[in-house]
């Protein structure tokens, strides 16, 4: 997976993308790399960026991918056939385990701001979680609102950069936007509350288990990254983590509902507790994919 910056001459090969991963299974079947089963075809995908395997369950019939369906994803127009993505043994993409610092929470000293409690969690992708209120936010912010607030964007990037430096991804947090723009993903969370989505839909706090906003390449994600949801699900079962602190106590870990700018994303986690710490077996969720184009791109040398 390669992430191309839209405002810098930069391509990052760090981390993975769950939304892009959802298209790999259908492509593999379309190209004959995997034989289609009748009903559901499971495609095991090895992601070289993270050295992890993702199992994609794709609906198939008569040797072909079934794209049409009635499954809808919040923030994505239309409906399609669901693709179940299961991230197997997702912890430790950086080679340092689920908690790469060894702690459920760490305190970062942010220059010009002060101490900030964070949870740095690595499952599917490494994320740095912080409570919205710690940064003067609510968790109800929308991308159009936050992306024009230069001071908040700078603060969020500074926290992310300090986390990146702590992880050894850069030797100076000020260089993180260039040296490691994609990971860790900056994410701020809050307790469930009523809010309005980007398209004006009113969401009730009873329908979600927490509020969350993700940053991607220094801007607010319009909805929620799938790998981010996987890491959020894993973080939800870590005792004392920032995510667990704001999570609805009655939340079902097989059905965690994340309230994001586009609506609600549902995800889950399978795990075992050993010595009061979770061992993550897998995290899972649903995406869709549609065939948009078949063609030839001519690359000039």
Model regions and ranges:
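Non-transmembrane, aqueous-exposed alpha-helical and coiled segments at domain scale
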Residues: 1-301
């Amino acid at each position: 997976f390669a992430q191309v910056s839209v405002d810098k001459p930069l391509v990052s090969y760090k981390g993975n993308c769950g939304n892009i991963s959802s298209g790999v299974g259908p492509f593999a079947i379309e190209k004959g790399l995997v034989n289609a089963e009748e009903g559901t075809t499971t495609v095991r995908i090895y992601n070289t960026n993270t050295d992890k395997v993702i199992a994609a369950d794709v609906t198939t019939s008569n040797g072909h991918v079934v794209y049409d369906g009635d499954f809808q994803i919040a923030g994505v127009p239309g409906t399609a056939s669901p693709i179940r993505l299961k991230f197997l043994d997702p912890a430790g993409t950086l080679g340092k385990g689920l908690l790469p610092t060894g702690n459920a929470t760490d305190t970062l000293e942010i220059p010009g701001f002060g101490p900030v409690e964070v949870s740095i969690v690595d499952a599917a992708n490494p994320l740095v979680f912080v409570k919205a209120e710690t940064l003067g936010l609510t968790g109800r912010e929308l991308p159009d609102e936050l992306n024009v607030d230069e001071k908040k964007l700078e603060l969020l990037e500074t926290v992310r950069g300090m986390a990146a430096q702590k992880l050894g991804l850069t030797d100076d947090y000020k260089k993180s936007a260039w040296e490691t723009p994609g990971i860790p993903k900056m994410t701020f969370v809050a307790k469930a509350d009523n809010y309005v989505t980007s398209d004006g839909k009113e969401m009730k706090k009873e329908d979600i288990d927490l509020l969350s906003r993700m940053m991607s390449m220094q801007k607010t994600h319009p909805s929620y990254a799938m790998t981010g949801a996987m890491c959020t699900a894993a973080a939800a079962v870590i005792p004392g983590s920032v995510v667990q602190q704001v999570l609805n106590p009655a939340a079902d870990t097989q059905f965690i509902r994340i309230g994001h700018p586009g609506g609600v994303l549902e995800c889950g986690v399978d795990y075992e507790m050993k010595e009061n710490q979770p061992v993550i077996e897998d995290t899972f969720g649903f995406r869709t994919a549609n065939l948009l184009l078949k063609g030839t791109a001519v690359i000039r040398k």
